[in-house]
UniProtKB/Swiss-Prot annotation:
It comes from Saccharomyces cerevisiae (strain ATCC 204508 / S288c) (Baker's yeast). It comes from the Eukaryota. Glycans are attached at N595, N1289, N1324, N1346. Transporter involved in the uptake of sterol. The keyword Transmembrane applies. One of its GO terms (cellular component) is cell periphery. Residues 410-418, 493-494, 546-636, 1112-1117, 1197-1204, 1252-1355 are extracellular. Residues 31-273, 751-979 form the ABC transporter domain. CDD domains: ABCG_PDR_domain1, ABCG_PDR_domain2. Pfam families: ABC2_membrane, ABC2_membrane_7, ABC_tran, PDR_CDR. Residues 2-388, 440-471, 516-524, 658-1090, 1139-1175, 1226-1230, 1377-1411 are cytoplasmic. This is ATP-dependent permease PDR11. It is found in: Membrane. Belongs to the ABC transporter superfamily. ABCG family. PDR (TC 3.A.1.205) subfamily.
Amino acid sequence: MSLSKYFNPIPDASVTFDGATVQLEESLGAVQNDEESASEFKNVGHLEISDITFRANEGEVVLVLGNPTSALFKGLFHGHKHLKYSPEGSIRFKDNEYKQFASKCPHQIIYNNEQDIHFPYLTVEQTIDFALSCKFHIPKQERIEMRDELLKEFGLSHVKKTYVGNDYVRGVSGGERKRISIIETFIANGSVYLWDNSTKGLDSATALEFLSITQKMAKATRSVNFVKISQASDKIVSKFDKILMLGDSFQVFYGTMEECLTHFHDTLQIKKNPNDCIIEYLTSILNFKFKETSNSIVGLDTPSVVSEENQALNINNETDLHTLWIQSPYYKHWKAITSKTVQECTRKDVNPDDISPIFSIPLKTQLKTCTVRAFERIIGDRNYLISQFVSVVVQSLVIGSLFYNIPLTTIGSFSRGSLTFFSILFFTFLSLADMPASFQRQPVVRKHVQLHFYYNWVETLATNFFDCCSKFILVVIFTIILYFLAHLQYNAARFFIFLLFLSVYNFCMVSLFALTALIAPTLSMANLLAGILLLAIAMYASYVIYMKDMHPWFIWIAYLNPAMFAMEAILSNELFNLKLDCHESIIPRGEYYDNISFSHKACAWQGATLGNDYVRGRDYLKSGLKYTYHHVWRNFGIIIGFLCFFLFCSLLAAEYITPLFTRENLLRWNNYLKRYCPFLNSQKKNNKSAITNNDGVCTPKTPIANFSTSSSSVPSVSHQYDTDYNIKHPDETVNNHTKESVAMETQKHVISWKNINYTIGDKKLINDASGYISSGLTALMGESGAGKTTLLNVLSQRTESGVVTGELLIDGQPLTNIDAFRRSIGFVQQQDVHLELLTVRESLEISCVLRGDGDRDYLGVVSNLLRLPSEKLVADLSPTQRKLLSIGVELVTKPSLLLFLDEPTSGLDAEAALTIVQFLKKLSMQGQAILCTIHQPSKSVISYFDNIYLLKRGGECVYFGSLPNACDYFVAHDRRLTFDREMDNPADFVIDVVGSGSTNIPMDDAEKPTSSKIDEPVSYHKQSDSINWAELWQSSPEKVRVADDLLLLEEEARKSGVDFTTSVWSPPSYMEQIKLITKRQYICTKRDMTYVFAKYALNAGAGLFIGFSFWRTKHNINGLQDAIFLCFMMLCVSSPLINQVQDKALQSKEVYIAREARSNTYHWTVLLIAQTIVELPLAISSSTLFFLCCYFCCGFETSARVAGVFYLNYILFSMYYLSFGLWLLYSAPDLQTAAVFVAFLYSFTASFCGVMQPYSLFPRFWTFMYRVSPYTYFIETFVSLLLHDREVNCSTSEMVPSQPVMGQTCGQFMKPFIDEFGGKLHINNTYTVCAYCMYTVGDDFLAQENMSYHHRWRNFGFEWVFVCFNIAAMFVGFYLTYIKKIWPSVIDGIKKCIPSMRRSKTSHNPNEQSV
């Protein structure tokens, strides 16, 4: 099918710059200011590019080179916000002023960067289906055909049922994920496309296909495309119609590629190195490297490329290049065209013909599409789905059985109130657990909104709608189980009203916490807001504090609380028509009073009337709780109003507030904090181990040339190198041996693998692979998805699942010491996973000390090599710098056996890529064995590799040997192939030959005419399709020679008699590991000021809120009840605090799982211990703040005997919730599941502590849980400390009136009862009405609640036991989850039990698996 017919761009599109001087915010670009120290504040910088003049027409693809490219692209993308240019110049889209056009038609400007952000639990086809549904209002069948065609074009048909995945969720490979991003961008259907390093992670063949498709799409849809590429072969460069070259301050060229080369090479006489590809040549001009001699070009001893003519032109700086550009005929040509275009443009407003609807589908379809995707997300994330379902079912069973068969008595009415309150509170906690998922959705939603797939508020509305639907199912399950176990009224009306209000209240909480997530910039701040909201909801639901007892300054909160209205409606619905038996509450009672008329007794329950041994439910509601049944449907309307209000505010926040929380805005805010709050500055200006030079690069105080260690450091590949020890080009010989002592003393070993097969399920990813590495630099190459990363993981012993067969040998001997092997190798992952709040130097130092020899001086060498600003935070690094840091983290370990690198040059510009490969070459020349996957290598880059190991799709080896011989090998076996050593890139040649082609686009040259369609199926190198290169290699003489060479090398290695384990660096002691990781975690925590502020603010705010709510607690019966609920609310604060702790600890956990664990950086228990040690002082100090804010407001005793012991126990409680939160985080597969576990286990343990249900009413089966719940002991200790020896003076309404029999005083009449049950009389000697108070002192109340002051130290010991249990469970949970990896087995077991979850069609494709 032809795809072009579905695209409707603006006709005659063009982008014209006429002498425009553009000012751009530097933070918008990918380029970071390396000279800026992270310890110093600077305002957001601005890039100013002067005199930009060019015109790009419809159907053209323009290559843009230069440091400011990313900033320019983002400026054009956010044209109406961030693009500023001088009035003397002009920027036009057609005849429209660009900023006006960008404001009126933002959907016509499409931006794609190097980041691949997707929902990991959606499959590839679901992701593309969604994008197509948002942009094309066509029948479903056409959309499916269009999807399949796109997947076919981009070579993704074989993974369409596979999860997309991310760095932490296994899914498609990185290259395949990049292609998904490209497809999404194409689907956006714009007129101007800005491709910002969009080929990062693609091999050269796939990148060429991408450019071919872009070129065809540009011509078919008549769009304008601007492309930034860091590395590209000449064949790729030839695909571009024009090239725009930007210096830091000026434009230096625009025109065709042929004109560009003529201008610089022929006219300006800037010579080109024969091994450099075009993009390397042009990049060197922009970076002004053509003025440098061989001594300043890292590792090269080639002659100077500066000609006499060039020197005569006196090109000394960028201004000279710009001057020569404007003097050229090319500039005059384009200046005439752009001036004419601007002169003809007299329109002040945007042409109405160019304005089209921003969104391609109606709102109804947007809502439907987003809702369907929400359903697919939740079904895909099975861990989260199952954890929610299990928690609701188990919780309803447990609580239903706890309140089993509630009696129709006055005491039973309290249980009914507790059950109602618990139901409301449980679903509040469950809604709170959704906040982490809300934050994880936001980056993907932000990308889609920028692509104009839908309105931001539509996604919010759809997500809320689906969450409400899914929660409704949970509420129905919960209600059915709980309602009938508790034996609430068996009446259809009562049941459905209970279900209705619990459901609507739950919807309200879903919207409220969704709103909280949308208005908070970070999850820590969201947890702060949610913590305060949670307290307000719980305390002012009119159950913890009755309406009549609320202080007047806070009673208004109850009327703003949906829980209060839900509580009144549900409890009124249950009690209004009941008659509650009062036999357990009659005063006086006992054998002495059995024969006395009831006219002398009274029912001690609110709402009781004299002479009746029962209480009507409606009377209890009215007098005790201030409830009335007549408010039920009024409250329903009010809750619906709250729901609509929260939902409306969520939609507004999604549209206008959340978009403000971009990285750029948050960096600005962080800069303001640094400027006005110097104490927040996290960097040290003085460092004992390193100093900073003018370039912001860490250099040791000792000169590099003087480094001398037992294993000598590799000299820096910077200008500070000794000129008498240089890397020669591979074609040259190294004839200087005077500096051999400087080289790393690496004993040569032979690492070989034979008949390696790797299978996951029924899919074979590596098929009978054999090879070896002894020394030198070997490139592991193949098309995207061929299994390169998988083979690296197998060889480095990093596979986590599947079956590996075959042999891995060291010097011909089977590998037995895997731990030593892992410590002898380095592995640079494709994903750049680091702790964001460490500096570059700190990141390198940790790796050096834990995995290397601890040579801190060597850190300066690596920093100089990689040109990294040592004192800059990782969070402030550009993507390129993060990649360099990943390499540096492995280099500082000095791997003695083998260094693996997975695409180390991906995303780097040509110069940086060449620098890295040159350094790798230097290491290999010193004996280091290096195996490196590489994408898109230029001819000069690939020439540094000694050998290549070539894979085809399916993980089959098709060649192993030197690269020149590889080209000869393929040509010799297929005479129809041709290879020109002078012109062709050998890397591109071998990939083209063995690659089956990711798409069906022909690999034609730029000169070949291109069709206006993008669907002509022509395969790669048709002439080679009939050859099975894998089978040919297995029987080839070349493989026999490889085997013979391996035997000789192994024999030499065995003769040396050196065991590779002798060169393994001894790891630091266990205590040293703990010390170093604890210091690291402390630094990361200290620098996260948002987290620290949120923790202290939540404790202070919650303490004051609770303290003022229970202000000066009275010495009456209500005061006793208030004391219990005060302590219960103090424990409730732990829930949002746990969420904060988990969010913070997640960062280091993910880094450990993704990188450090696989590299044996330190023992897994070290991370858990270090995180606990670092969090402990924060928990204690913040809990101290809470205690000070709360305790002294409530009016309890302030002596050390009471307040001191209370404080001691609360500090222990802070240790409990800290260890509890870390246990669940380290035992759960992800943060969302951990949040559900917190909600479930918190409500589970809290329900058995005797607050919700009195111990006397516990079913016998559950009495053990009363003893097992840690909250039982905390509550008993806290309440007994507050109420011990506290005098009770009942208020008039709390006095129980009774009438003595004739001839007796009240004291005489009530004495038997008081002797048995306690209490006191207001007046003993009266003969009329006896005013009885149930308690004399607080200990009487404690005894009734099964509590005792004398248990406080016993409880203190039990509390320590629970803390120790949490810590032990944390270790066990982490071991089972991440060492033994039990979760996949658990999920598989559940899938077998639930047939609907058996999704065989959605299998994973771990060709190049993520963690």
